[in-house]
Amino acid sequence: MRRLLEPCWWILFLKITSSVLHYVVCFPALTEGYVGALHENRHGSAVQIRRRKASGDPYWAYSGAYGPEHWVTSSVSCGGRHQSPIDILDQYARVGEEYQELQLDGFDNESSNKTWMKNTGKTVAILLKDDYFVSGAGLPGRFKAEKVEFHWGHSNGSAGSEHSINGRRFPVEMQIFFYNPDDFDSFQTAISENRIIGAMAIFFQVSPRDNSALDPIIHGLKGVVHHEKETFLDPFVLRDLLPASLGSYYRYTGSLTTPPCSEIVEWIVFRRPVPISYHQLEAFYSIFTTEQQDHVKSVEYLRNNFRPQQRLHDRVVSKSAVRDSWNHDMTDFLENPLGTEASKVCSSPPIHMKVQPLNQTALQVSWSQPETIYHPPIMNYMISYSWTKNEDEKEKTFTKDSDKDLKATISHVSPDSLYLFRVQAVCRNDMRSDFSQTMLFQANTTRIFQGTRIVKTGVPTASPASSADMAPISSGSSTWTSSGIPFSFVSMATGMGPSSSGSQATVASVVTSTLLAGLGFGGGGISSFPSTVWPTRLPTAASASKQAARPVLATTEALASPGPDGDSSPTKDGEGTEEGEKDEKSESEDGEREHEEDGEKDSEKKEKSGVTHAAEERNQTEPSPTPSSPNRTAEGGHQTIPGHEQDHTAVPTDQTGGRRDAGPGLDPDMVTSTQVPPTATEEQYAGSDPKRPEMPSKKPMSRGDRFSEDSRFITVNPAEKNTSGMISRPAPGRMEWIIPLIVVSALTFVCLILLIAVLVYWRGCNKIKSKGFPRRFREVPSSGERGEKGSRKCFQTAHFYVEDSSSPRVVPNESIPIIPIPDDMEAIPVKQFVKHIGELYSNNQHGFSEDFEEVQRCTADMNITAEHSNHPENKHKNRYINILAYDHSRVKLRPLPGKDSKHSDYINANYVDGYNKAKAYIATQGPLKSTFEDFWRMIWEQNTGIIVMITNLVEKGRRKCDQYWPTENSEEYGNIIVTLKSTKIHACYTVRRFSIRNTKVKKGQKGNPKGRQNERVVIQYHYTQWPDMGVPEYALPVLTFVRRSSAARMPETGPVLVHCSAGVGRTGTYIVIDSMLQQIKDKSTVNVLGFLKHIRTQRNYLVQTEEQYIFIHDALLEAILGKETEVSSNQLHSYVNSILIPGVGGKTRLEKQFKLVTQCNAKYVECFSAQKECNKEKNRNSSVVPSERARVGLAPLPGMKGTDYINASYIMGYYRSNEFIITQHPLPHTTKDFWRMIWDHNAQIIVMLPDNQSLAEDEFVYWPSREESMNCEAFTVTLISKDRLCLSNEEQIIIHDFILEATQDDYVLEVRHFQCPKWPNPDAPISSTFELINVIKEEALTRDGPTIVHDEYGAVSAGMLCALTTLSQQLENENAVDVFQVAKMINLMRPGVFTDIEQYQFIYKAMLSLVSTKENGNGPMTVDKNGAVLIADESDPAESMESLV
């Protein structure tokens, strides 16, 4: 019987589902990177830049401290009177007879494969390698094009052009730059010589269709997403990127729009724009830039990369004199927001409509001017209002001058009437704007009417609403707020009215009798409204094309899946497809607006929804019915509203008269019928498209379409009214649809009965199986059990967490998506992983891009919901509005008794599977102050022992996480008392040990065998060197961090809690690396792609950027090649012995390690600053120079190039990432640079290790004598004392003390200089090497800033001192050493330090000697007050590696 019922269950489920489900349009949520709409008011790329002491050329940016207003400090020309860009006023531009047709040469040819595109960090530039020439248009000669640059705005077609025409700006501006090839060989040379250059400005305007000519450019943009990326472009025709007609253009003389702002540019600004679709436009908004801070890189979206417009001053703007080029109206070329020419509207609609009562008989209507004006100026506003009373319909219209306040007072208002208001802007020649939102007002309740929905926005009549009640639901076209007013109705009207240009008004909409009853009328009091009540514009060509694939119903529009906030989100006409195609990546964790920052603005957000419904709200005097109330059913069936005797059901019909299903998320018996009178306008519209397809009757339903538990759906008796589709025709008889309805209902009822029987039987079987398990679902069998069954998988199956009976239910039916499980077949053997990564890196990292796109798409078709996160009671608990917790995998807290227990189980956290372990991790956001108690409650309830934190509290001036632990002593968070026990600081991370105690659990209570269950230990591993939306500079420290935090987990503890700021990007990267390291150890295979796709189904956006995805592979490659090299001190002798034994090929592991130390990835050792011509003479040895990532920068001197460079590198120590600075012995002409470095970086210790004594006296001594100070402009250097310190072998260290005094203020810096003898000394015992190290370590404890170490070249001696210092500190603190990591990190940060295997072998010898000294009881050597060494080592000077081993 069971074998028979198992397949029946699936067949019946699919059959029933397919009969009631419908088409759904999905919208991707805003990602962490998608900062777009959240920061539109900010100019620039949202990068908050701190003033840096190091930079290359004069640094500038589009915002912040180096923004346009500060450009003049480094480029004086930026303050000139003839600057660009400008706003061009067409009416003041004169026609210049000298400006005739442009002559283009080569523009019609396809570009060669040498043309390439580069992300410069400020823009995206195309470097033209072919010959493109321009003449005419008043240019002084024949000019050659060299490069193309782009400027764009923030998001979604917002203004981004630099120039504007009549105040109108465009989404993108393309600029083509030219130079005179007869005079110069390059564009840059012409600029440096300050000679005339040319520039074309071409505007891009949004269009409903893709522009195929832009395809090579858009494809190229996807290859240069990150800063400094370059790619070759597919062939394109440059002429196709220009307007179709080149006759209409403006000419003026201006400047470059970026520093140096040279006023040498002859500008040609084309009047006609080039079309670009929203989908293509998204490629610009996905571009990243980087901000370098010290040697940590942060990644930001590059947006708003345009300069503010400048004054025209005494310049004249001219127009071309090409005949007939200026005849057309401007709207033929400057398209309306929907991208069609059919809509000749004056402006966008007036916004911010409000209706407020002044007294008992008067109302005030207010609005704001339109956001965009196509035909300025606005002359006046037309205010229309209509009302209905006792079936009499009236309407009045009056005008209001635009120069007065935008308010109107309506007198003699009756409290018993329903009023509808709308406003329209009127320009010259009686051109009018779109209508504003239609506001419905009755008594003290205001509602917005738009399309198929009515939303209330009024004020309370009984009691004030709570802040949660007034919180907006989502952004969109309507506002949904509540104020405690009893409100229970549904409007299912779809308006199709006239265009704004003045055609006759027709209305295809009716408010149901239920609506009127909800507004105070008796049932059925009004059957329809006059045809002039709700006129809206006829759909444009763009919307028609959208609706061709999705016909509009008279009863309801198609529903949409949840948008960023989980609400059903419809598309606006002309925008829907493009919005639906937004790339998930267009978002920044870093760029998002945090919830707490926007609390004040929440009331201005709007909700997108294609579902016609209204949430039933109650004031404090009306009790809310419970789910068990007889007034409604629990599972979304008929819902009876008090005051209505009966619910009626209507099935709408499609155009062909066949049965039409309700929208997704709505059962057919929940659709409200409305009367839609047939009109000629609709008939013409529907019949005008011969290719319009019929709507299929069956579509998959989106389980994401949900309603709150207070939503009620009311139906109206269809017998009273006719129903109509988009085409006018006689209404069908009542029996035509009642008989099929009865048949279908009967079949559905029979199927449901059978389905319930199957479910009961199925559940009974599962209960028998799971007997003995406390949870509803059985635990997934171990990998061994699955292997015995022949279905062994690489990872555990997806786990879903069923609602507890005590948890609040937001929706009646919570669906569980079917999630695929990664297979062992996808795993890559470790031996092939190196080759695999090489393939991914090939072809400009194309393999990584393809993989990550697959990751982004993997959850697109899964209807995974996050309704609890979107619930109004929980929204304030989310740090970011678009980072939500999936319902099926969310961590549920135990509800708190009493205090709002209904929603106290929510926290923005999800269980995430690990390698062969379900729920191995909890991925969560950085706690908000308001969620500290929930955070620690979750840690207690989940028995978490390890917290992994991968964010700093503040990054780039923005709050990323609140400090949820006490700085010292104890702090109480709800019932949990947290005590800080210890803090250990490392170079890249910090470890904190907490004791947590639950005050509600008593010591030794029953069931507590240990007697101390009320107190636990929690360890926090906090990584401090990982930038938001970016990746760490080096993989080795991350591997150490992951391994140590993973090893600290105890078997009896619960999941590891991992969080960053949003809990997705860096959190996901950590989880993947940790799990893959475990898989490598267990099976010697790797499956990054499969595992990431799997965990993406458990929390959204895990591993947020492609850069993070690449970093995972880099880190795993490092782990595979280097293996684990950390060794405890008691095993060091045997370990060294093992790596000295030759292998099969005759090579020892020591040799293999050293090869990895010296072979570094090219991207880590870029040294282009050191190789500049102006800096080459500052290097003693060209083979020992700083890598760009770790280069020490100087504060540049004003007006002098290259003054920021010095041959010096940061080196990571044990306690700080910049603990040391290794540099060369100063050259005579770099001595002042050396002291500037000390001054800039507050260094207080200098260790001088001369490799030989061959330096001349004047070169050897770079410090001043006692008699005379050294003047370094901003400060002076004075020698104040000189001492000597004797070592055990009678060698001496000469100690100089200097004072650096500022010339402008009282700041003083004390510096101690150690002039050391030859070190390490080959004639002395190896163990004596640590004498000098101990002296330096002890001195460093009392001083701040990095320790500067130098030998002649800044190479092996200095590197050896840093390495041994770090390793000795590691040995003291951890009783373990990692020679390989320390040596490789030094070579990564300063290439060329260790070049000989004997140098690497010496480090092992020294550490063996130090370990032997500790084992023999001789602790570290110290120095007494007089400088004498208290413990001297008398070891044999002939120590060798063999003897040490």
Swiss-Prot record:
<feature type="topological domain" description="Extracellular">
    <location>
        <begin position="20"/>
        <end position="736"/>
    </location>
</feature>
<dbReference type="GO" id="GO:0005001">
    <property type="term" value="F:transmembrane receptor protein tyrosine phosphatase activity"/>
</dbReference>
<dbReference type="InterPro" id="IPR003961">
    <property type="entry name" value="FN3_dom"/>
</dbReference>
<dbReference type="GO" id="GO:0042802">
    <property type="term" value="F:identical protein binding"/>
</dbReference>
<feature type="region of interest" description="Disordered">
    <location>
        <begin position="461"/>
        <end position="480"/>
    </location>
</feature>
<feature type="glycosylation site" description="N-linked (GlcNAc...) asparagine">
    <location>
        <position position="619"/>
    </location>
</feature>
<dbReference type="GO" id="GO:0007169">
    <property type="term" value="P:cell surface receptor protein tyrosine kinase signaling pathway"/>
</dbReference>
<dbReference type="InterPro" id="IPR000387">
    <property type="entry name" value="Tyr_Pase_dom"/>
</dbReference>
<dbReference type="Pfam" id="PF00041">
    <property type="entry name" value="fn3"/>
</dbReference>
<feature type="domain" description="Tyrosine-protein phosphatase 1">
    <location>
        <begin position="848"/>
        <end position="1119"/>
    </location>
</feature>
<dbReference type="GO" id="GO:0010633">
    <property type="term" value="P:negative regulation of epithelial cell migration"/>
</dbReference>
<dbReference type="InterPro" id="IPR001148">
    <property type="entry name" value="CA_dom"/>
</dbReference>
<feature type="binding site">
    <location>
        <position position="1028"/>
    </location>
    <ligand>
        <name>substrate</name>
    </ligand>
</feature>
<feature type="topological domain" description="Cytoplasmic">
    <location>
        <begin position="763"/>
        <end position="1445"/>
    </location>
</feature>
<feature type="disulfide bond">
    <location>
        <begin position="78"/>
        <end position="261"/>
    </location>
</feature>
<feature type="active site" description="Phosphocysteine intermediate">
    <location>
        <position position="1060"/>
    </location>
</feature>
<feature type="glycosylation site" description="N-linked (GlcNAc...) asparagine">
    <location>
        <position position="359"/>
    </location>
</feature>
<dbReference type="InterPro" id="IPR013783">
    <property type="entry name" value="Ig-like_fold"/>
</dbReference>
<feature type="compositionally biased region" description="Acidic residues">
    <location>
        <begin position="576"/>
        <end position="591"/>
    </location>
</feature>
<keyword id="KW-1015">Disulfide bond</keyword>
<dbReference type="InterPro" id="IPR036398">
    <property type="entry name" value="CA_dom_sf"/>
</dbReference>
<keyword id="KW-1133">Transmembrane helix</keyword>
<feature type="signal peptide">
    <location>
        <begin position="1"/>
        <end position="19"/>
    </location>
</feature>
<feature type="domain" description="Alpha-carbonic anhydrase">
    <location>
        <begin position="58"/>
        <end position="321"/>
    </location>
</feature>
<dbReference type="GO" id="GO:0004725">
    <property type="term" value="F:protein tyrosine phosphatase activity"/>
</dbReference>
<keyword id="KW-0597">Phosphoprotein</keyword>
<feature type="binding site">
    <location>
        <position position="1104"/>
    </location>
    <ligand>
        <name>substrate</name>
    </ligand>
</feature>
<dbReference type="GO" id="GO:0005886">
    <property type="term" value="C:plasma membrane"/>
</dbReference>
<feature type="compositionally biased region" description="Polar residues">
    <location>
        <begin position="671"/>
        <end position="682"/>
    </location>
</feature>
<feature type="glycosylation site" description="N-linked (GlcNAc...) asparagine">
    <location>
        <position position="109"/>
    </location>
</feature>
<protein>
    <recommendedName>
        <fullName>Receptor-type tyrosine-protein phosphatase gamma</fullName>
        <ecNumber>3.1.3.48</ecNumber>
    </recommendedName>
</protein>
<dbReference type="InterPro" id="IPR016130">
    <property type="entry name" value="Tyr_Pase_AS"/>
</dbReference>
<dbReference type="Pfam" id="PF00194">
    <property type="entry name" value="Carb_anhydrase"/>
</dbReference>
<keyword id="KW-0677">Repeat</keyword>
<feature type="compositionally biased region" description="Basic and acidic residues">
    <location>
        <begin position="592"/>
        <end position="620"/>
    </location>
</feature>
<feature type="region of interest" description="Disordered">
    <location>
        <begin position="557"/>
        <end position="711"/>
    </location>
</feature>
<feature type="domain" description="Tyrosine-protein phosphatase 2">
    <location>
        <begin position="1150"/>
        <end position="1410"/>
    </location>
</feature>
<feature type="glycosylation site" description="N-linked (GlcNAc...) asparagine">
    <location>
        <position position="113"/>
    </location>
</feature>
<comment type="subunit">
    <text>Monomer; active form. Homodimer; inactive form. Interacts with CNTN3, CNTN4, CNTN5 and CNTN6.</text>
</comment>
<dbReference type="InterPro" id="IPR003595">
    <property type="entry name" value="Tyr_Pase_cat"/>
</dbReference>
<dbReference type="InterPro" id="IPR050348">
    <property type="entry name" value="Protein-Tyr_Phosphatase"/>
</dbReference>
<dbReference type="InterPro" id="IPR000242">
    <property type="entry name" value="PTP_cat"/>
</dbReference>
